[in-house]
Each structure stands twice: as structure tokens, then as C-alpha cells.
């Protein structure tokens, strides 16, 4: 029995339907899109300060650069897979992708600033932070809001039902604090 084509974990297997929305952010492709975003925004930040004899990019050029991560898709995923097979370095492949796209956009003059003064860890830590933040904001919190709405509905329906709480001391009455906990997030 060949197990290479099997899911890596139950999340890719039997629970895939429950976590599909997270793939946009927490998959390898989602991480690579965030890495491209970090590299592009770093380039924009450097040129905005006219560093190294550059001048600020026009708004149109900034939008064309930002399209690199906004329109990130299968072509970029495939390009990165080919390049990473050679480099054996994920962030270096991202750097090469950005440089390649800069050339295609006619922005060769700033290509040398790609990844300037950055380590792979700089790019990765910012990218992981972006992916987790967006997964929480765009997938997890909306799902939590649905659960809280259902709990409110059930609470109203069962408002007369007594609920006892006890941890270590005497029994006391309680509520679940779902709304307050969500507000704290």
C-alpha cells in the first residue's frame, strides 16, 4: 500500500471540509502569497524613502506591484515549485519570482532592492503573522460569530433552565460568557 498520496493529517483528510477556508491562508500557497506581499511592500517602502538612488514609485507602479500578490495564482505556484526544486530554498524562490515579475513590469531598476537587508526569517516571520492574522479575522472569527449567534438563540429558548456551575467550591449559578469572550478577542 502506497501512503504517499494520503492526507498528512486528519485536517487534510476527514476534516477537510471543515477547514477548507483556512487553506487560502495557511497552505503553502497562502504562505507564499504572503511572502510575495512582504517582499513587494518592502520594495515599496524602500523606494518611498528614495533609498539607494531610487525615486518613489508612481501609484500606478505600486498597484502593478501589489497585483503580484493580489493576483497570486496557479501560474505563480507552479513557477515557484520549479524554481524551488533547483534552489532548495523557499524564500530564495520567492525572491527570484519577484525579480522576474519586476523585469516583466519594466521595473528592472529596483530589482536589486528585492530582499535587500532581509533574512529569510524576516520574510517568514512577517508572512506567518499575516497568514495567521487573516485566517483568524476572515475565517475563524466569522465562524465563531455563527456559534455565538446559535448560543444566543439557544439561551433565549432555554432562559428558564437552571444551570449549575461548580469547580472546586460550592455550587453557583453561571452563564457561559460567550459574548464577553468574543468581545475580548
Enumerate the language-model features and the residues they cover:
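Short, small-residue-biased leader/transition segments that mark boundaries at the very start
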Residues: 1-3, 178-181, 185
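A helix-coil-helix interface module used to build multimeric assemblies
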Residues: 4-177
Amino acid at each position: 500500500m502506497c501512503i504517499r498520496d494520503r492526507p498528512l493529517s486528519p485536517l487534510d483528510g476527514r476534516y477537510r471540509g471543515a477547514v477548507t477556508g483556512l487553506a487560502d491562508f495557511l497552505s503553502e500557497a497562502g504562505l507564499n502569497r504572503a511572502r510575495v506581499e512582504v517582499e513587494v511592500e518592502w520594495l515599496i517602502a524602500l523606494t518611498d524613502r528614495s533609498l539607494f538612488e531610487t525615486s518613489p514609485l508612481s501609484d500606478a507602479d505600486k498597484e502593478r506591484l501589489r497585483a503580484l500578490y493580489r493576483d497570486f495564482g496557479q501560474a505563480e505556484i507552479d513557477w515557484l515549485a520549479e524554481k524551488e526544486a533547483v534552489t532548495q530554498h523557499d524564500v530564495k524562490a520567492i525572491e527570484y519570482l519577484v525579480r522576474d515579475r519586476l523585469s516583466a513590469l519594466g521595473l528592472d531598476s529596483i530589482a536589486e532592492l528585492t530582499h535587500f537587508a532581509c533574512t529569510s526569517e524576516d520574510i517568514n516571520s512577517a508572512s506567518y503573522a499575516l497568514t495567521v492574522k487573516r485566517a483568524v479575522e476572515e475565517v475563524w472569527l466569522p465562524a465563531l460569530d455563527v456559534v455565538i449567534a446559535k448560543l444566543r438563540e439557544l439561551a433565549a429558548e432555554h432562559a428558564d433552565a437552571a444551570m449549575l456551575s461548580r469547580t472546586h467550591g460550592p455550587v453557583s449559578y453561571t452563564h457561559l460568557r460567550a459574548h464577553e469572550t468574543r468581545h475580548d478577542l
